[in-house]
Amino acid sequence: MKHTRRNVLKGASVLAAAAATGGIAVPQAEANKQPYPKGMAHGLTLLTMRRNSSEDYRLGVKTEKGILDVAAAAKLLRIYAPETMDDLLQREHGPALNTLVATALTAAAAKPAFVKEETVEYGPLVSRPAKIVCVGLNYRKHAQETGAQVPKEPVLFNKYQTCLNRHNGTVKLPVDLAKKFDYEVEMVIVIGKEASNVPEADALTYAAGYATGNDFTARDLQYETGGQWMIGKAIDQFAPLGPYMLTADLVDPDNLKLECRVNGETRQSSSTADMIANTRHMISYISRYIKLKPGDIIFTGTPEGVIQGKPKDKQVWLKPGDKIACSLEKLGELKFELV
Ligand code: MG
């Protein structure tokens, strides 16, 4: 058949019709054009897998049958599903993912798409958010331990995509630039739909899910570079995140225990119930000034127990070889090593 424009268009519409009935695998470029229903995924524990230690990232779902490799299942079942966490969030293809998972759990054909979690190499939970917004001094005792005023409204700063890091990864300490490296366990909000000037009462409906994160920090750069925070917190690899995102329907974000351990020793132990600005206030407040987009993430502040909060003669800063473990109740334990 001659590849006239008309034939190509006709071919695309046949593909779309077949896809709508679940009859054919749809390439991503084609899927972008499909009228898939928009919405967030529900009832799922999600992760990013990486293959061959490369930036070949794929969406995974933790199930009772193991980790479902979403792209592999979509191919086996010949139905569309978003292939990466960023595709899921930014295209708002939650319903397609829920359909795929429900089908895969009962279809014999999808069996090869389940893998053992022990064999999975984790990638950064998200890899291309449009924004990473961070809230500082959001726990009273942490504000007090650092000698700061307890803020009346959330104190905002930012990180960048190049900060993103993964569960079981490493943070390379830039020892030529800084010496005072510190941990900050934090709950991370993952945004699921566009939020602009949203009222507090509705704010939680804009969250796709929640994850464990660490707002890793070089204190000397944070406090000794002219009174601005970003440079101490936006260094490459300084935003470990993961291993999982739990969908928002599974989590009460304002009532989660959180902990940080260094080489097995507990350093931080608190609850998100102690946050000054709760989750709905943070989303609402940020959305007054900055339009939040699906796939954006928000670091929500750390509780007391950081090295900066100790008396000066007891401050032993982190060093290469230290192993950090951060956990949030239900959301999983994030581990990484300093090199
Ligand atoms: Mg922080």
Model-derived segments and their meaning:
Residues 5, 12, 28-154, 323:
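N-terminal non-catalytic cap/leader segment that marks the start of a structured domain
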Residues 5-21:
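N-terminal export leaders
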Residues 34-36, 217-339:
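Catalytic-pocket segment enriched in acidic/His residues
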Residues 50, 137, 159-161, 168, ...:
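Short, structured patches in soluble enzyme cores that scaffold and shape functional sites
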Residues 61-66, 191-193, 263-264, 328-330:
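Short acidic-glycine loop/turn motifs at beta-strand connectors
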Residues 148-167, 183, 320-329:
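Structural signature of FAD isoalloxazine-binding scaffolds in flavoprotein oxidoreductases
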